[in-house]
Each structure stands twice: as structure tokens, then as C-alpha cells.
Curated annotation (Swiss-Prot):
Pfam families: Complex1_49kDa. NDH-1 is composed of 14 different subunits. Subunits NuoB, C, D, E, F, and G constitute the peripheral sector of the complex. Its main location: membrane. The gene is nuoD. Belongs to the complex I 49 kDa subunit family. It is found in: Cell inner membrane. It catalyses: a quinone + NADH + 5 H(+)(in) = a quinol + NAD(+) + 4 H(+)(out). This is NADH-quinone oxidoreductase subunit D. HAMAP family: NDH1_NuoD. It comes from Ralstonia pickettii (strain 12J). The keyword Cell membrane applies. NDH-1 shuttles electrons from NADH, via FMN and iron-sulfur (Fe-S) centers, to quinones in the respiratory chain. The immediate electron acceptor for the enzyme in this species is believed to be ubiquinone. Couples the redox reaction to proton translocation (for every two electrons transferred, four hydrogen ions are translocated across the cytoplasmic membrane), and thus conserves the redox energy in a proton gradient. It is a peripheral membrane protein. Keywords: Cell inner membrane, Cell membrane, Membrane, NAD, Quinone, Translocase, Transport, Ubiquinone.
């Protein structure tokens, strides 16, 4: 009788658990994975090359579209790289607003992760709960920028505008009765800070709900404990960062170890795993949501007490106010030059890294003194994590590959760029 050889299976790119456009070529022995070969590039949009044809400020919206679940954090790394090249001082209020929205974005990302990860494993309820909370976070984005996803809110030298004093209200429609409308607008009667504070009061209870459903759930633990184990040494050698590295027991967080903006003024803890498996990475991310909530509350407290400018007054970098522009010819010229020719960034190179929800997201920008980047290199954390999929999945069942992809928190916008 002929020997039964390993067979090859295509997983994705149109698989519901492939997190976008991942194509995995799996070499199987029965149902056991011998080799996993990720094929990338199906969402490649040449972002790095496009940035070379655009002025420095025109590339901000492209950053939103890299990891399209963590929009503002991508922008943050990019504007920080420009600020380092310019040697620009950012107003303190703008720094606090950035930190607050970074953490709002982190919660937004982790809600998407916990919902889709649980859905992949077979728990549908968490996905629906997570999207209930994300709706409030999208409303926060919409209040400051007018856009629910691709905000383009951060600017070199600060942020686009200050936090609004009123929240947008839901309007009556054919699909909403008076009772539903009143419930939706109940928390929207005050300012944006009031709305965010109300959310931070409610959010810990929501995280408790997710933990009640998952943390001690027998099926959840059977599917995650001991799956995709990565030792601290291998995690470092593979270039892991973020929750993937902390889940393996290494206490590394860019916000603590290389503080940027005002993270050195804020009190928070770094959750760290022990076993380096999918379950530990789950626990780390859940605790990260609680810590982000804590950071947001500290930012709200500071922002309430300290009004001030939210963008630099250097009009070669940031536009003048509309009032000044309409009354002063010089300001009008600044505005015209900035949005036609763009700003000229001094010759040099800079690397800016932020603690992205998925790991260390870095922008390496090289300027030749022109109004466009000479070269822009994007360091995507998910790219490194996906490269380790073969090692993490070897010897596991095919169903465990879904769990491992979920625990890596893969989004292809940043991997394919």
C-alpha cells in the first residue's frame, strides 16, 4: 500500500478567519500542520512610494489607511517623525489630546480584536457586545474630525482643532422612535470631554462582561491555553513587540521605556504574561484595555483644568486661523503657500516609534530639504508577527491556526502597505 503523503491546503484569502486578505498555504499531515507559508501582498497599495509624490502634510490621510483599525496611532508616528526633523515643539494641550486619542484608539482596536478573535474560535456574543462599545468610540472620532474612521486629525505641530464644547446629536428618522432617540442622546448633552468621561465610567463594567463570558470559560481555555507558545528568547529573536512580546513575559512598552509626548507624566501599569501562549496574550490585551481607560481618565482631568493652544503658531508648518486669514494678507499668503507648495523640511533623517495597539509602529523619514519625503519607511508590527506564524503553528491542529492568527491581531493594511 502506498504511503499517504502530506497534502497542501489553501487557507484564504477569502476565508472568514483570515483577517482580510491572508493566503496561507498549509502543509498538513492529517489535520496536523507541518508547515505554514503566509502569502502577502494582496492589499499592497504602495503607500511608501505614494508618500514620495505627495507633500509632507498630504500623506497624513494615507497613514489612517495603513492599520485601518488603529487610525490615529498611525498618524501619530508620522507627525512625530516630521516634528523631529523640524525640531518642533508641540503645545502641551495637544500632547495630552494625542495621548488621550491614542488610548481611545487602543481600546477601539482591542475591542475589534477580542470580538473577531472570539468569533473565530466560535463565541459570537462578544463580537456583538464589542461593536456596541465601538460605536461610542467612533462618535468621539466624529466629534473632533467629522470622520468616523479615517480622521486625519493629527498634524505636524499639534492637532487639527481643539475638543468641541458640544457633542453631535442623533436626529429623528424613520428607523428611530422617540424612546430610542432619547436613549442615544442621553449622554450627548454636554461637551466631548463629558461624553468621554461618561464612557470611561461605564467601560470597566463592559470589560467585566467580556471576562465573564471568556476568561474562565472551559471551551475558551481549551482552545487557547498552550497554543502558539513563544518563549521570551524566541520572541526577542523574532522581533516581536507589543502584546505579542509582553505575553511572553518581557516587560517592554515604548510608552514606558522610551516615553514620548506626556506618557512620562501619566501613571499606568504594563501587563505581562507568563507562559507565552494565546491565553496569556488574551489576558494581556484585556488588562491593556483597563489601563487605557485609566490613562484616558487622567488626560480628561488635566484637559479640563488647562486650556491653551492645540497647534504650533509657526505658520510655515501649521495654517493660520480662518479669522486671521480673512483679515490679514500675510496670513492668507502663509495659508496659500502651505496648501499648494507645502512645508520644506530640513535635510536629515528621523525615526519615530509609538506603542501601537499591535506593537511598535515606526516611521523612518528621510528628507532632502524638499517639500516631499525623499524616502518613507514604515515599520509595521504585524509584518514581524506574521513571519513567525510558521514556527507558532507547527505541530498544532488546523483549527489552532485560526486561534494563532487571531492572537497575532493581524490587519493587512499595515502588513502589505
Amino acid at each position: 500500500m502506498a504511503d499517504i503523503k502530506n497534502y497542501t491546503l489553501n487557507f484564504g484569502p477569502q476565508h472568514p478567519a483570515a483577517h482580510g486578505v491572508l493566503r496561507l498555504v498549509l502543509e498538513l499531515d492529517g489535520e496536523v500542520i507541518q508547515r505554514a507559508d503566509p502569502h502577502i501582498g494582496l492589499l499592497h497599495r504602495a503607500t511608501e512610494k505614494l508618500a514620495e509624490q505627495k507633500t509632507w502634510i498630504q500623506s497624513v490621510p494615507y497613514m489612517d489607511r495603513l492599520d485601518y483599525v488603529s487610525m490615529m496611532v498611525n498618524e501619530h508616528a508620522y507627525v512625530m517623525a516630521i516634528e523631529r526633523l523640524l525640531g518642533l515643539e508641540v503645545p502641551l494641550r495637544a500632547q495630552y489630546i494625542r495621548v488621550m486619542f491614542d488610548e481611545i484608539t487602543r481600546i477601539m482596536n482591542h475591542l475589534m480584536w477580542i470580538g473577531s478573535h472570539a468569533l473565530d474560535v466560535g463565541a459570537m456574543a462578544v463580537f456583538l457586545y464589542a461593536f456596541r462599545e465601538r460605536e461610542d468610540l467612533f462618535d468621539m472620532y466624529e466629534a473632533v474630525s467629522g470622520a468616523r474612521m479615517h480622521a486625519a486629525y493629527y498634524r505636524p505641530g499639534g492637532v487639527y482643532r481643539d475638543l468641541p464644547d458640544t457633542m453631535p446629536q442623533y436626529k429623528a428618522s424613520k428607523v428611530r422612535n422617540e424612546k430610542a432617540l432619547a436613549a442615544l442622546n442621553q449622554t450627548r448633552s454636554g461637551s466631548l470631554l463629558d461624553f468621554i468621561e461618561d464612557f470611561t465610567n461605564r467601560f470597566p463594567k463592559y470589560v467585566d462582561e467580556y471576562e465573564t463570558l471568556l476568561t474562565d470559560n472551559r471551551i475558551w481555555k481549551q482552545r487557547l491555553v498552550g497554543i502558539g507558545v513563544v518563549s521570551p528568547e524566541r520572541a526577542l529573536n523574532k522581533g516581536f513587540s507589543g502584546a505579542m512580546l509582553r505575553g511572553s513575559g518581557i516587560e517592554w512598552d515604548v510608552r514606558k521605556k522610551q516615553p514620548y509626548e506626556v506618557y512620562d507624566r501619566i501613571d499606568f501599569d504594563i501587563p505581562v504574561g507568563v507562559n507565552g501562549d494565546c491565553y496569556d496574550r488574551y489576558l494581556v490585551r484585556v488588562e491593556e484595555m483597563r489601563q487605557s481607560n485609566r490613562i484616558i481618565r487622567q488626560c480628561i482631568e488635566w484637559l479640563r483644568k488647562n486650556p491653551g493652544p492645540v497647534i504650533t503658531d509657526n505658520h510655515k508648518v501649521a495654517p493660520p486661523s480662518r479669522v486671521d486669514m480673512k483679515t490679514n494678507m500675510e496670513e492668507l499668503i502663509h495659508h496659500f503657500k502651505l496648501f499648494t507648495e507645502g512645508m520644506h523640511v530640513p535635510e536629515g533623517e528621523a525615526y519615530a516609534a509609538v506603542e501601537h495597539p499591535k506593537g511598535e509602529f515606526g516611521i523612518y523619514a528621510i528628507s532632502d530639504g524638499a517639500n516631499k519625503p525623499y524616502r518613507l519607511k514604515i515599520r509595521a508590527p504585524g509584518f514581524v508577527h506574521l513571519a513567525a506564524l510558521d514556527e507558532m503553528a507547527k505541530g498544532h491542529m488546523i483549527a489552532d491556526a485560526v486561534t494563532i492568527i487571531g492572537t497575532q491581531d493581524i490587519v493587512f493594511g499595515e502588513i502589505d502597505r
